[in-house]
UniProtKB/Swiss-Prot annotation:
Physiological role: Cell wall formation.
Protein name in the entry: UDP-N-acetylenolpyruvoylglucosamine reductase
InterPro entries, per database record: FAD-bd_PCMH, FAD-bd_PCMH-like_sf, FAD-bd_PCMH_sub1, FAD-bd_PCMH_sub2, MurB, MurB_C, MurB_C_sf, Oxid_FAD_bind_N
PANTHER family linked: UDP-N-ACETYLENOLPYRUVOYLGLUCOSAMINE REDUCTASE (PTHR21071:SF4)
Pathway, per record: Cell wall biogenesis; peptidoglycan biosynthesis
Amino acid sequence: MIDNKRGSSYLNSLPEGLSAEECDRYSAVVSLCWNVLGELQDVEFKWHEPLAYHTTFRVGGPAACLARPRSESALLALLERVRENSVPYVVLGGGSNVLVTDGPIPALVIQLIHVAAGLAFNKGRSSSRPLVVVGAGVPISRLLRFCVRNELGGLECLVGIPGSVGGAVVMNAGTAEGTIAEALEWLDALDGAGQRQLVFKADLPAGYRSMGLPEAWLILGGAFRLHVSSGRSLKREMRSLMVRRKATQPLGRPSAGCVFKNPVEAPAGALIERAGLKGFRMGNAQVSDKHANWIINLGSARARDILALISLVENEVFGKFGVRLEREIRILSPEKNSLNQMLNS
């Protein structure tokens, strides 16, 4: 529930530097959220929350309102109220595959860090292929620790990938060693009308960096068919994979991982490197000198620097090789076609 004693400060304070049009649109969303969501129970609200705090790129302007439901029932009530009142909204997962623009975002941003966070499997099961049920809000790193602790193999390919399980499912995250879809059994989701859907992997058109889900669906969780392994061998395998990743990827810098999908002609990183752009920078955004398909924030980059660098890479690769790179990351901006998304990332 919203603290009404602080209401005037929330409604009257706006981010600096807005044009009159931006100010009107942003303040309208703040007021709308305040008026239609204020009585909801078991939801944490933050106002004018910088999204740079919630993305792995560490860039992004403030959201009109950020909501964190503390239970599944609170999430369902929030989404119902949002749909009934046409509140522009985005569901944001771990923020690992998204670039938020610098300006204020006139929308409600919903995070699932307090809900859809369960992890369970039947320890007494005699099968060598146990089923693990995971909430969409569970960080991938936590899922992997759970697997090691319970000696369950099958998801080692995800080591080093940031973000949440929900985001990993939406984009069918993976590496050269495999993808999350390979272990997926079924998904628990809300469709665009807010109806609960149980979808089996056999019914999903999963492909490269996509699970083939409708844009408006929200992942609540899923089940993964794993195999019994030894905790020691799992640790050894994950450690080996992590050493390789650290040697070839700039894991210590703020980034969103690979920026582009690999085209059929050649890996995107190889094309970018052949175009002479490895290490190239614009402002404090740089094409990584470790992996050319990664753009990193050197510490004080703005989203506009990163976007300009992405556009330059696209134009240079197309000009030299005739290949149009397709973006793997999602862009969240004040534009209306950017909102009402289930980023889950």
